[in-house]
């Protein structure tokens, strides 16, 4: 240090003053250093190194701040991103993809699923039971009605997210069991049904509680419906052919397969034909008994029916037509035999009956006209008996049978 324009005594006075001031400031500096060492445990930010808040992005000028996920936060800025809960006083907080969550929201969104029965969390190490998109504790997977625990392989049903054992679910579908109906009653009923079945009892004894036993698969009728029994040989032919008659007051029905429950009798949906549809189909049947795919397509356009319905109708019509012809032939033979017996026709070898008086022959003649689509088919059976035989009345009328097939 250089001192210019100062005498010797003045220089010594200045040096003494500087020494005195240095001695008086030394204790204050040491006390400040000691006090700073004790306050370093408190989170504070000095003005020369102020940090930015990870929540709002502003500078942290507060004396105290929060440190979470290796970032600084204002005490008011550390909040849950879902429910906006202030996490200043919370013991824990969770971070996922840069977002802060409270404990409840984190477990709700990212943790394991909760039990659908008790609504408690399920840890990753627990064994669970799954039904649809729901998860259950092993002890919580029980029947809602009887609290029977269901294990792997047991049959169960679900309705409105509620689990039922097989027996109670069947009863629930029928809506027949009372509120006090428990699993013991159903088990007793099942045992009684099994005993009754082994003893050969009927349906009433086999199911005392009236519960339909459900096997999980709906019963559906397969294949074609069973054929109805045709009328016997002695049935009235006109009444039998009335099903194919077309008039203003009658309509024909077609049986079709219909799924039906196993606990009820067979129910079939019946298709009714209108009069113009029947006339069109019967007119074509008089020309062709077995239409091909092209003909069926044309008929479907004319009648408005499906090809399947038309196929079934023509199949039934062909079957009835064949049965009527066979029955008519049998009826003609029977009447010819009866007439021959009444007139005393001699029986013997064929050589003894070769007389001209037996002409025309008593064999029935069948005439079938299918050329006109609008006229009904007439089948005539003519039985002639020789008039020169003894015991035969000369004016006996011939027997004629007219059969209307439509």
UniProtKB/Swiss-Prot annotation:
Name listed for the protein in its UniProt record: LIM/homeobox protein Lhx2
Motif Nuclear localization signal, residue numbers: 307-323
Compartments, as annotated in UniProt: Nucleus
The keyword DNA-binding is assigned to this record: yes
SMART domains: HOX (SM00389), LIM (SM00132)
Domain of life: Eukaryota
Free-text comment about domains: LIM domains are necessary for transcription activation.
One cellular-component annotation, GO: chromatin
Stretches assigned to the LIM zinc-binding domain: 53-105, 115-168
InterPro entries, A to Z: HD, Homeobox_CS, Homeodomain-like_sf, LIM_Homeobox_TF, Znf_LIM
Keyword Transcription: yes
Keyword annotations of the record: Activator, DNA-binding, Homeobox, LIM domain, Metal-binding, Nucleus, Repeat, Transcription, Transcription regulation, Zinc
A Pfam cross-reference name: Homeodomain
GO molecular function: chromatin binding; DNA-binding transcription activator activity, RNA polymerase II-specific; DNA-binding transcription factor activity, RNA polymerase II-specific; metal ion binding; RNA polymerase II cis-regulatory region sequence-specific DNA binding; RNA polymerase II transcription regulatory region sequence-specific DNA binding
Subunit text: Interacts (via LIM domains) with CITED2. Interacts with POU4F2.
Function recorded in the entry: Acts as a transcriptional activator. Stimulates the promoter of the alpha-glycoprotein gene. Transcriptional regulatory protein involved in the control of cell differentiation in developing lymphoid and neural cell types.
Listed Polar residues bias regions: 328-356, 396-406
Any one GO biological process: neural tube closure
Compositionally skewed regions (Low complexity) per UniProt: 357-374
Segments of this protein annotated with the region Disordered: 250-270, 328-374, 387-406
DNA-binding region(s), chain positions: 266-325
